[in-house]
C-alpha cells in the first residue's frame, strides 16, 4: 500500500507564510516595473501589515495582500489603503485569506465592498521523499534560463497564450518584466533543444511560489507542464524550501493538474471590490 503524503496544517501560520510569499513576489514585480519604466508610477506601500501595490490601472497585480492577516484592520488603515489607489487613479481590490481576522471582513462589508472572485491557494511539502527524481536524458528537458535568455523565456511564455491575441500581447509585456524580478527564477522546457514551455518560481522565507507556466500550442501533450513542475520542485528542495505553493481558478484544469502532482487546496481566497454605487 502506498504511503500517504503528509501536509502542514492549513492554519493561520501557514496562510501568513503563503500570503507573504505571494505579496513579496508581486512587490518584486512592481519594483522591476518601476526600474524598467519609471513613468509607470509602479510602487507599493505597507499599512498595518497589508501590502498595497500599484502596477498600472489595468494590471492584475494592482491590489492588496495580507489584509487582516497579521493584525486587526482599522477604518483609518482602510482609508490609507484606499487613498493610495485613488491617488493613482486605480480601483481598489483586496485579496483576503479566509483565515484573516473576522473583523476585517466586517469592515470591508460596512465600507461597501463585495466578494467577486475566488482563488484556490494550493500547497504541498517539499521534502526529498516527495520531490520527483530528475528525468533521464531524452527529447524533453527542463533547465534554468540564463539571464541573457530573458527575451527567449518571455516570448515562449507569451506564445502559450497566442490563441487569444490580446492576451498574448499582454503576457509578452508582463513576462518581459517578470523575467527581471529580483527573486525570480525562470525555467524553460525544451523539446529536441527547442523551447516549448516556460514557468516561473519565486522564493520567500522557505516558500516556493510557482507561477507563469504555459506551453506553446505546437508543444502541447508532450509532458512539458509536468516536467516543469517536477524541475521546479527539485530546485525548491535544493534551495532549502519546505513548502511549495501555487494558485489556480477553482475547478480549473490547472488545479486538477496540480492535484495530480501532489498539491492540495489550503484554502479558497476571496477578492473584494467596491459595490456599484458605494462611495
Show which residues each predicted segment covers.
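Short amphipathic alpha-helix that is part of the acyltransferase structural core
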Residues: 1-28, 66, 119, 129-173, ...
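N-terminal charged segments
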Residues: 1-86, 168-169, 180
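Conserved beta-hairpin
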Residues: 43-48, 100-114, 183-197
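A conserved beta-turn-beta hairpin within the catalytic core of GNAT-like acetyltransferases
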Residues: 55-64, 116, 203-211, 220
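Acyl-donor-binding surface of acyltransferase catalytic domains
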Residues: 70-151, 247, 252-254, 270-274
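Conserved acetyl-CoA-binding loop-helix of GNAT-fold acetyltransferases
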Residues: 74-83, 215, 221-238, 260
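A conserved beta-strand-loop-helix scaffold within acyl/acetyltransferase catalytic domains
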Residues: 165-218
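C-terminal appended segment following the main domain
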Residues: 226-279
Amino acid at each position: 500500500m502506498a504511503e500517504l503524503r503528509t501536509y502542514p496544517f492549513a492554519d493561520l501560520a501557514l496562510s501568513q507564510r503563503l500570503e507573504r510569499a505571494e505579496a513579496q513576489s508581486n512587490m518584486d514585480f512592481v519594483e522591476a516595473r518601476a526600474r524598467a519604466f519609471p513613468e509607470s508610477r509602479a510602487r507599493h506601500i505597507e499599512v498595518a501589515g497589508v501590502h498595497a501595490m500599484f502596477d498600472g490601472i489595468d494590471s492584475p497585480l494592482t491590489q492588496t495582500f495580507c489584509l487582516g492577516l497579521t493584525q486587526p484592520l482599522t477604518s483609518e488603515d482602510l482609508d490609507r489603503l484606499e487613498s493610495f489607489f485613488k491617488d493613482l487613479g486605480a480601483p481598489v481590490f483586496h485579496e483576503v485569506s479566509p483565515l484573516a481576522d473576522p473583523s476585517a471582513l466586517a469592515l470591508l462589508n460596512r465600507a461597501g465592498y463585495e466578494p467577486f472572485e475566488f482563488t484556490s491557494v494550493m500547497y504541498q511539502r517539499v521534502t526529498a521523499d516527495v520531490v520527483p527524481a530528475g528525468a533521464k536524458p531524452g527529447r524533453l528537458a527542463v533547465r534554468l534560463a540564463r539571464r541573457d535568455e530573458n527575451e527567449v523565456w518571455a516570448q515562449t511564455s507569451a506564445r502559450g497564450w497566442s490563441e487569444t491575441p490580446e492576451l498574448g500581447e499582454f503576457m509578452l509585456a508582463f513576462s518581459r518584466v517578470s523575467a527581471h524580478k529580483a527573486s525570480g527564477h525562470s525555467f524553460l522546457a525544451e523539446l529536441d533543444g527547442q523551447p516549448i514551455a516556460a514557468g516561473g518560481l519565486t522564493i520567500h522565507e522557505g516558500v516556493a511560489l510557482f507561477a507563469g507556466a504555459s506551453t506553446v500550442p505546437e508543444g502541447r501533450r508532450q509532458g512539458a507542464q509536468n516536467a516543469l513542475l517536477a524541475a521546479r520542485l527539485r530546485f525548491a528542495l535544493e534551495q532549502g524550501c519546505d513548502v511549495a505553493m501555487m494558485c489556480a481558478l477553482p475547478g480549473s484544469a490547472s488545479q486538477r493538474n496540480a492535484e495530480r502532482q501532489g498539491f492540495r487546496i489550503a484554502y479558497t481566497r476571496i477578492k473584494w471590490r467596491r459595490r456599484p454605487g458605494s462611495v
